[in-house]
From Swiss-Prot:
This is Uroporphyrinogen decarboxylase. Belongs to the uroporphyrinogen decarboxylase family. HAMAP family: URO_D. Pathway: Porphyrin-containing compound metabolism; protoporphyrin-IX biosynthesis; coproporphyrinogen-III from 5-aminolevulinate: step 4/4. The gene is hemE. CDD domains: URO-D. Catalyzes the decarboxylation of four acetate groups of uroporphyrinogen-III to yield coproporphyrinogen-III. Homodimer.
């Protein structure tokens, strides 16, 4: 594979020296960009974008053509795995993701197949290899998957949920069924991420979007334990380089020490944590990624710059920090403000890497 021209993202994840703090944004290829909206219109709908490697490559690269980002992230969706299990993913306008079928009983879960990463999700692997080829070493490519608990909530609820009542009822009423579902999902996610790594992903992130909805005891047993299982099963070196693993639980600020203990390289933080305190709590065990509140991007560029400066100062000197938002960038953000955010990080962080 082509040598990397900019590897500061991978270096920061592995706590190696960098010249400036690297940055990428969750959902950086998304609806806030007019070029993304044009591609989505050409593709017809969201799933056609995901399932066509050329379209997926095109939208993955769009933010990199516009901004000096330090990493690309595969354009896909966390729900590709339940879709490949036969649940029939579709998107309702204004409603978000839905499934034609849901799982509610032990029998439903026993009947679920574990998807073959190459055969059933080959379009994702094709997208990864296409993007790597097109990137030509500009920046590293991040692969990703949803966490077992997060995927399970969509499969049981049939879509997004405000209170996760069906998933939590299953967790407490029928823990055997929930554990079987989570175990199947952990096996599926492990194979899926390893497939992405073999296809060319140079780092991977596990998105535990809904782990923060659980009680502490339930989080440890039904979310964290399965992410640990995945991390233990991942390919950690490929193409002569380490493949760093990032784990991100939104709302996981109470459990940073436990999350830092599962063997991942990097801990993703949402905006409710102070990054300096997080650094003290986890010590040198993991690097940190985050964590500006994405809604700060609706403020003026000077205010964005101030908040970037505050977070950089809170983290302090040295490597081990990848700057990001505390969750995905939202559709109404002005692309110029995203640019101001990225430029501020590179301009203001050099002093911390002398």
């Amino acid at each position: 594979m082509t040598a990397l021209k900019n590897d500061r993202f991978l270096r920061a994840l592995l706590k190696q020296p960098v010249d400036v703090t690297p940055v990428w944004m969750m959902r950086q290829a998304g609806r806030y960009l007019p070029e993304y909206r044009a591609s989505r219109a050409s593709a017809g709908d969201f799933m056609s974008l995901c399932k066509n490697p050329q379209f997926a490559c095109e939208v993955t690269l769009q933010p990199l053509d516009r901004y000096p980002l330090d990493a690309a992230i595969l354009f896909s969706d966390i729900l590709t795995i339940p879709d490949a299990m036969g649940l029939g993913l579709y998107f309702e306008t204004g409603e978000g993701p839905r499934f034609k079928k849901t799982v509610s009983t032990l029998a439903d879960i026993e009947a679920l197949p574990i998807p073959d990463a190459q055969k059933d999700l080959g379009y994702v692997m094709d997208a990864v290899s296409t993007i790597r080829r097109e990137l030509n070493g500009r920046v590293p490519l991040i692969g990703f998957a949803g966490s077992p608990w997060t995927l399970a909530t969509y499969m049981v609820e049939g879509g997004s949920s405000k209170d996760f009542r069906k998933s939590k009822a299953m967790l407490y009423d029928n823990p055997q069924a929930m554990h079987l579902l989570l175990d199947k999902l952990a096996q599926s996610v492990t194979a899926y991420l390893n497939g992405q790594i073999l296809a060319g992903a140079q780092a991977v992130q596990i998105f535990d979007s809904w782990g923060g909805s659980l009680s502490s005891a339930a989080y440890q047993e039904f979310s964290l334990a399965y992410m640990r299982k995945i991390v233990n099963g991942l390919i950690r070196e490929h193409d002569g380089r380490k493949v760093p693993v990032i784990v991100f639980t939104k709302g996981g600020g109470l459990w940073l020490e436990s999350i830092a203990d599962i063997g991942a390289d990097t801990l993703g933080l949402d905006w409710t944590c102070d990054i300096g305190e997080a650094r003290q709590r986890v010590g040198s065990k993991v690097s940190l990624q985050g964590n500006m509140d994405p809604t700060v991007l609706y403020a003026r560029p000077e205010a964005i710059r101030q908040e970037v400066a505050r977070i950089l100062a809170s983290y302090g000197s040295g490597t081990g920090h990848v700057f990001n938002l505390g969750h995905g960038i939202t559709p109404e953000v002005d692309p110029a403000n995203a640019g101001a955010f990225i430029n501020a990080i590179h301009e203001l962080s050099a002093q911390y890497h002398q």
